[in-house]
Every structure is written in structure tokens, then in C-alpha cells.
Amino acid sequence: MKEFTYLQDELETMKQQGTHQTLKEIDSKQSSTVTLNEQSVIQLSSNNYLGLTSHPRLMKAAKEAIDEFGAGTGSVRTIAGTMTMHERLEKKLAAFKKTEAALVFQSGFTTNQGVLSSILTKDDIVISDELNHASIIDGIRLTKADKKVYGHANMEELEKILKKSMNYRVRLIVTDGVFSMDGDIAPLSEIVRLAEAYDAFVMVDDAHASGVLGENGRGTVNHFKLDGRVHIQVGTLSKAVGVLGGYVAGSAVLIDYLKHKARPFLFSTSHPPAVTRACEEAIEVLLDEPERIETLWENAAYFKEKVIGLGFEVAPTETPIIPMMIGDEALTFRFSKALIERGVFAQGIAFPTVAKGKARIRAIITAEHTKEELDRALTIIEEEAKKLNILD
């Protein structure tokens, strides 16, 4: 049988450069601490912002759903895979996001792909922030629309593109709400102002803002008091919500169209009952326990202040994403490995996830972290950084 020698060669190069990674196997519930390699470590790499992955109400809802409805649905949504709970979840999401309707996909990644590839044609143009998530980039690649990229959060450049693109049928501005690698928030008020001035649509990917920003975690649109002025809101059910999946919220016309045209929706089996019911319960928890979001922000502010005090260069974050900039990729991964060995799970992030020379340790703070855990992590981070001459 023919071998994949060309792939093996590339893997060997990655190993020589110190950028080859192995998957970390966790053997516990996802929480502020996890079991990794039979060792308890402080978790600083999870997107479990509010600690909902192991919330008793979500776990109870999932268990009861399995007992009543089974392990799976056995079909796609458009044939025999739509249960009452799927429709109920989508109505809850629409109400939560203050839109007319919503549609759930298998992941946030496929949501962006499904939306972008469905609603744009060769007569249209999509205008994207240069630091948008990979799922947006891949979704744009699936369209036949023209593409323009503006410099990160550069509103002058965005306006120039809008002025030069008046002849297109549809112009769609796409942006992350919170940028996942740097933790900064999109200037959405200005984006919406420009969109309204130049008759363009706006799409926001709120993966890292849902459950984090806005009233009860409603996201970036609500954070900027722009409810009703953003055409497409994409979110995940796998980060702050704590379960699995993605969704799009918007007008009834948009959602009805996507039900007929979005290929990831049309050709994927629907969410199993346990996942669906847990997602439903998570929305209720967001409404019932706003103190979780308050604690999240308190912990994030505390950790950020301490990290800067240690002397780290921190990306211009405005959220619980705290990127400690290292630069060199191999050094970043050595640092990450040293931290894990000392009991701090803080994953190194490097090219192609971020630009070359922009490698970093990305810490994500959660509502579950105690001050004692954060202080312990900070002590270990400082000690290992000094050993590697990252800090003086």
C-alpha cells in the first residue's frame, strides 16, 4: 500500500522545530482543576467560562433525557430527526438573543460554514476582519462571493471598502464579537454605524462572547445595546454554555432559508437528546445565576493585573482571555510543557493558529477558579518563566 511519506516528512520537520504537539488526555470532569497524566492540574486552557460543563442541573437534564428519549435521534432534522426539544431550544435561543428565530447546528464551526456558504452568491461581497476565526475564513472560501479583508478593527479601511463596493447586490460585514486569540472586543457600534450608512448586512460570531458579555451573557450585540440592529448572530453551545453545538439567530426569513439551504444542517444528524436538553437547561442557568458572570469578570481582572505585574507582555485583551506573549514558537511550547509538569495546564498557541512570531500562552480564566488556585498558578508561571529567561 502506498505510504503518506510526504506527510511523514512534514511531521518530522515539526518535531525538529519543536512545534509538534500531542493531545492532552484529561481523566476527570472539566473544572478549575482537572486530572492530567494522573496528576491534578489547574486548568487555564478550557473555554468552560462559567463552569457549566459539570453544573448539576445540566447533568440532571442530560441523564433524564437519555432515560426518556434514548441516546440519539437517528436522523437529520429535515427527515425524522427533529424532536420537540430541538424546536424548544431554538425558541429559547431566539428569545435569549432577542431575535425572531434561531437554528442549531452541530458546532460553531459548521454554523459559520453553513450560513456563509448559503446566503452569498457571485453577485455579492463579504468583508471580513483579518483576525476572524478559521471557521469564518473557511466559510468564506466556500462561497462564490468576492472577498475583501480589512485590517484588524480598522474602521477607516472598512469604510473605504464599503465605498468602493456599492455595485454589489449584497455586502456582508463579518466579524468576531470577541477575538479568541487576543481577547479584544470588536468595535461593533462603529461597524453597525457604517453598515447602516452604506446599506450593508452585519454578521457577528459570538463564540467567546455568548455567556460572557451582555445581560446574562447575551453577547456582544447586547453588550453594545445593538439588539435589533445586527442581522446575523452566530454563537456556540460548547464554551460558556458548556455543552456542544452552534447556532445562528436572526430574522425568521433568514432562519427559514437556512433550513432549506445550509448543507451542514441538511446533511448532519440532529443533536442527541442529552445534548439538547443540557443546552436548554444551560440557557435557564444563565438567566437564573448571573452571579457566575460577575465572578468570571472578577477573576479575570485579578489574574490579568497580576500577570502584567509579573512583567509579561499581555495582548490588548478586554475579556477573560489573557494571552501572555512569548513570540518564539519552540520556547512557547517548552514553557507550556514546563507549566503542565508543575501542575498548571496552560496551552501554548502558535502558527498557524496565530501569526508567526506571535506565539503565546493563552490563559482563559473561569468563574470556578478560586483566588488560591489563581495565586498558585501565578507563582508557578513566574518561576518557570524565569527559568526559561522569559522573565528577568
UniProtKB/Swiss-Prot annotation:
Transmembrane stretches, start-end: none
GO biological process terms, semicolon-separated: biotin biosynthetic process
Residue(s) carrying N6-(pyridoxal phosphate)lysine: K239
EC number: 2.3.1.47
Cofactor: pyridoxal 5'-phosphate
InterPro entries in UniProt: Aminotrans_II_pyridoxalP_BS (IPR001917), Aminotransferase_I/II_large (IPR004839), AON_synthase_class-II (IPR050087), AONS_Archaea/Firmicutes (IPR010962), AONS_Archaea/Proteobacteria (IPR004723), PyrdxlP-dep_Trfase (IPR015424), PyrdxlP-dep_Trfase_major (IPR015421), PyrdxlP-dep_Trfase_small (IPR015422)
NCBIfam families in UniProt: bioF, gly_Cac_T_rel, PRK06939.1
Name the record gives this protein: 8-amino-7-oxononanoate synthase
